[in-house]
């Protein structure tokens, strides 16, 4: 057996001695006991650092969604089920139920389905202007009128002045227009080419009550009205029906030159003095197009280096000064269609119109011009009939077109509306202004006046005379020209006709009185019968072929000075004041002509509308008189258009 002995004593730990040459290091002291860490001091007062906190996603609901939730709750569905489907808490749904009257009212203010897509109930700052512009926009889009941003902005400012007065400072900026578009859901689209007029605007809006179409005063149109369908339903309104008429005019013929043989007049006429004038206007007379003057000069000197678009009348060349088919076609597409489209767009009307012409023009310009002494029946027989069917004149979309009232000799002649007194009134007004110019230039001979009165002055006189024709006269002439095509007028309109006719008769008599007075003032030996013959000389005729023709012995007319003379009632001291002044050196004829030509060059550079033809004609007449008295040759500053 083993016996327990004394406990074993562990052997002492040997210390490793450092290698020779290295000192022995002392033993490491025991590690101190760990001391508990003290709390950090509280942070100093100041802005707390941002801490990224994950927030719940916030969704905005449209008015349409809110109304759907309200309708489901009103239908008996539990609010918890509706909240679960829409993902909103119960408090949000109860807020929607509380704001239901406000939501309905907001939809009434915006109108249509556009408001249901809105997420905020925010109206415009100027609600009246916004509502007026939107109603105006819907009304125009119902008629297919294209609208641009600047046009809508200008109309908004006009509404602001009407609502708040002329002192209103409202400005329809681009930002206002953008917000107005977004508020009503209107988009901008670019239009390419000429498209059919749309029936309704692109913006959805409230249903507009359609009123029955009012009967227009134009009835069935002859020949082509039934065969060619209108570009849009509803026919043509009064402002969309136009008429064009052609007439001849001696544009510088004075009463003394038109005196018959044996009456003591010169009776000499010039072929170059005759032009053809095309007049066109709509039924109401509210839109009168620029007169078209057709002459025999291919390049009139007085029209060179001038912008003819600024003249109140247009000029075209024809060998016989008559309207041909190419001229009618060019005028239709270059002047009539653009002018009518601008007027219809400005008047907020549908882009369609019809032009009534008495008969188609000659296919060529070789028609014999009837003599003045021939009867009316002979004149009509001399007018050649078209060799082929008349050309279809209309725009590619068919919105603007031409209808001929008479196509041939076998059909009944339908008088054009403008032939019922409007053309005669235009000629009387033109000749009155021509006589006024002749009287104002009474210091020289009639030949000086005829040389100084150029084709450019004639265009201004033609435009002025056409502007003086009243719109009521044009409207009344339609009842005489196409009486069977109009529907019966109401009693109140028929009762008002005599007053208008009496006013027109008074205006006609006043023009005739002015003509007689001016003729008596300018010509001493002229009888009233000769003035009447001069007025009606170019009603239906042209000139015989052969250029210049003498109808009797020539005699220069006697012109009574009636221009810038001093009245006889003035005292002699005033009339003879110039003699008492100190005499100065008299300029020579060359110096006077050079000064007058310098003044003419300056005057022609001014605005023609402010200067007018009177001053130019007077100055040219003075130049011709000075050259004639000084024995100087013709002036290059006074070109001759008609002689």
Swiss-Prot record:
Give the subcellular location: Nucleus
Q: Does the keyword Ribosomal protein apply?
A: no
HTH CENPB-type domain: residues covered? 117-190
Record-linked PROSITE patterns: HTH_CENPB, HTH_PSQ
Q: Which GO terms describe its cellular component?
A: nucleus
Q: Where is the composition biased (Pro residues)?
A: 20-48
Among the GO molecular function terms of this UniProt record, one is:
DNA binding
Main location as per UniProt: nucleus
The keyword Iron-sulfur belongs to this UniProt entry's keyword annotation: no
Q: Which SMART domains match?
A: CENPB (SM00674)
**Domain HTH psq-type residue range list:** 52-103
* InterPro entries per record: CenT-Element_Derived (IPR050863), DDE_SF_endonuclease_dom (IPR004875), Homeodomain-like_sf (IPR009057), HTH_CenpB_DNA-bd_dom (IPR006600), HTH_Psq (IPR007889), WH-like_DNA-bd_sf (IPR036388)
**Which Pfam families does this one have?**
CENP-B_N, DDE_1, HTH_Tnp_Tc5
Residue span(s) of domain DDE-1: 238-358
Q: Which residues bind DNA?
A: 79-99, 150-183
Q: Keywords in UniProt for this one?
A: DNA-binding, Nucleus
Give the residue ranges for region: Disordered: 1-50, 197-236, 366-395
- Sorted alphabetically, which PANTHER family does this protein's record hold? TIGGER TRANSPOSABLE ELEMENT-DERIVED PROTEIN 5, TRANSPOSON
Say which family it is in. Answer: Belongs to the tigger transposable element derived protein family.
**Name of the protein in question:** Tigger transposable element-derived protein 5
Originating organism: Bos taurus (Bovine)
